[in-house]
Design a protein with these regions (language model features):
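Alpha-helical multi-pass membrane segments and their bilayer interfacial helix-loop junctions
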Residues: 2-387
Length: 387
């Protein structure tokens, strides 16, 4: 389903693993060069600065082309303009497929920009050709192409868009069921976020879905944030008051407020504790960030101190928390340490041996097993830090 060449994607991961191993002095330069020659990558993926430049250039060209189109159909009706916009989005999509299939672009900035503009013009075109669409309809309209683009291109932004629009479908569909549904909405969103977190954690371990690992990681972070936001007192009170017209007065609480205060205070602590227990840096860092949300929420409704003192107190709490976590992890506890590896990519890459074995079994003709790489005198394959 994914548009990029599978073999090149696998070889890219292997090469990145080899570079990480080289930086950690686990293999020699000759061995790293041998891996690179044995597993060539036929993809164009420039560095970050060139990628940003190509993205901006593609955006300018795409918008200029659309501007010329607008001048040509200036006197057309809104529906005709929508049809032309839809055609233009399909042209952009065709260009995207061409750049990937023929020019071998992979996260070069050009394909990233074309993905965004293609889905953007598609959604705009449907809105122009249709009567006003409800929030539920908009969520469905965005989810369908975003999910397709996620499967087709493994794009991180499309993963986030598909996930959020799916939650939008649930949200706007569920609140139509009445007041009880509105009251239960925070708990439903928390449940969905928790289920999403468990599923993407399982998906990251599935070798068949290895090319979507970055998407899984992004959804994992989003699900943790949404789980907390759906249980945060400030978010629940203000969103409910705004969307459901509760007409709450200043100082007036929502029903069951104590439940959300408990979630507000305990979830970040739970994130931090579980992050330490599971050696999960995403849980740990998210929990540390959410400590600031606790301070903000408490300060917003309870003016126990001037703003400057409250902010200083919150900062001191976060610094002390980070300090004690650092001290706890020095020396390393149970294979978990505060120290950064030489190459951060080691935390997110797949197991090299698994990929080599997979490629070996996918060969049309059987090949003789090769001798493992020599790491400092011992034989065996390098393993990344992936659990």
């Amino acid at each position: 389903m994914i548009a990029y060449n599978h073999t090149s994607l696998d070889n890219l991961i292997i090469n990145e693993e080899a570079k990480a191993a080289l930086q950690n002095n686990l293999i020699s330069k000759e061995e790293a060069a041998g891996i690179e020659n044995k597993y060539p990558v036929n993809l164009y993926s420039p560095n970050l600065f060139i990628r940003i430049g190509l993205l901006l250039l593609t955006a300018i060209i795409t918008l200029m082309g659309f501007g010329v189109l607008c001048l040509m159909i200036l006197d057309s009706s809104e529906k005709q303009f929508g049809i032309m916009t839809l055609i233009y989005s399909l042209v952009i999509y065709a260009g995207l497929e061409f750049m990937i299939y023929d020019k071998k672009h992979y996260r070069s900035g050009i394909d990233d920009a074309l993905i965004l503009f293609s889905i953007g013009f598609m959604v705009t075109a449907v809105n122009l050709m249709s009567d006003p669409i409800s929030y539920l309809g908009q969520s469905i309209l965005i989810f369908i192409p975003a999910f397709y683009f996620l499967l087709r291109f493994g794009n991180v932004l499309m993963a986030g868009t598909a996930f959020l629009s799916f939650l939008g479908i649930i949200f706007y569909g569920f609140i139509k069921l009445g007041d009880m549904a509105k009251s239960a909405m925070p708990f439903l969103l928390m449940t969905l976020a928790l289920l999403a977190y468990w599923q993407v954690r399982k998906g990251k371990k599935n070798l068949r879905l290895r090319h979507y690992r970055s998407c899984f990681t992004f959804i994992e972070i989003l699900s943790l944030l949404i789980l907390y936001a759906a249980g945060n007192y400030f978010v629940v009170r203000e969103v409910s008051n705004s969307m459901f017209d509760l007409q709450l007065k200043e100082g007036e609480s929502i029903p069951g407020a104590w439940i959300f205060w408990v979630f507000t205070a305990l979830l970040p602590i739970l994130y931090i504790v579980k992050g330490l227990q599971k050696k999960d840096v995403i849980l740990l860092r998210t929990g540390l960030i959410m400590v600031a949300a606790i301070v903000f929420t408490v300060r917003y409704y309870h003016h126990v101190a001037p703003l400057e003192i409250a902010m200083s107190t919150g900062g001191i709490i976060m610094i002390l928390l980070a300090y004690f976590v650092t001290k706890y992890l020095t020396p390393p506890k149970y294979g978990f340490t505060h120290a950064e590896p030489n190459d951060p990519k080691l935390n997110g890459l797949l197991n090299l041996e698994s990929l080599i074995v997979t490629q070996t079994f996918n060969q049309a003709t059987p090949a003789e097993p090769e001798k493992g790489f020599d790491f400092g005198g011992g034989n065996g394959y390098y393993r990344s830090g992936l659990n």
